[in-house]
A protein has these predicted regions:
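A short, N-terminal "cap"/entry segment at the start of jelly-roll beta-barrel domains
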Residues: 1-33, 125-157
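Short acidic-glycine-tyrosine-enriched beta hairpin
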Residues: 4-6, 71-89
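Conserved short histidine dyad/triad with adjacent acidic residue
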Residues: 21-22, 36-51
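Ligand-binding loop in jelly-roll beta-barrel domains
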Residues: 29, 86-112
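Residue-level recognition of specific faces of alpha-helices
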Residues: 32, 56-59, 114-117
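Hydrophobic small-molecule pocket/channel-lining residues, especially in calycin-type beta-barrels
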Residues: 44, 52, 65, 116, ...
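Glycine- and acidic-residue-biased ligand/ion/polar-headgroup-sensing regions
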Residues: 53-56, 60-65, 70
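A hydrophobic, small-residue-rich beta->alpha segment in the mid-to-C-terminal subdomain
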Residues: 113-126
Length: 157
């Protein structure tokens, strides 16, 4: 089955204050891959984490991001490509003063279910819902159910 989407199309969710739009999901790709477009707010990004099942590929469409890969931090900007194999602790942060844009491919598919569970369907694509600190515990618990570990400092749990 082909997937044909125009700019802005796809299923969008607010995830920890950032906008994730799913372009291809496991249901559409027979479990092969998930593709999502992410708009990451200034200083936004996920907590450090490890995927035990999935590899991730990031293409920076716009912006500058600091990626922590294991113990190494590197800065990447528009046009950069980053492949992160499963088992690698990583995180990233938008270090610009404006939103940045990423195209992310995850293989195999399935991790979108985690994002659906921790996110909020995006009715308004410009204004995220207020941050609820209770989400942190939910993120840690649901990550375990999706073969991930999330490293949250104790003062934030």
């Amino acid at each position: 089955m082909e997937i044909l989407l125009n700019k802005g199309e796809g299923r969008s969710y607010w995830v920890l204050g950032d906008l994730y739009t799913f372009k291809a999901t496991g249901k559409q790709t027979n479990g092969t891959l998930t593709v999502m477009h992410q708009v990451i707010k200034s200083q936004g990004g996920p907590p450090p984490h490890v995927h035990h099942r999935e590899d991730e590929v990031f293409y920076i469409e716009e912006g500058r991001f600091a990626f922590l890969l294991g113990k190494d931090q590197k800065i990447f900007e528009t046009g950069s490509f980053i492949y992160i194999p499963k088992g690698t602790m990583h995180t990233f942060k938008n270090i610009e003063d404006k939103p940045g844009r990423l195209l992310v491919t995850i293989t195999p598919a399935g991790l979108e279910e985690f994002f659906y569970a921790i996110g909020t369907p995006a009715v308004d694509l410009h204004n995220p819902p207020p941050f609820d600190p209770a989400i942190i515990g939910k993120v840690v618990q649901l990550a375990k159910e999706h073969n991930m570990e999330v490293m949250i400092p104790e003062d934030q749990t």
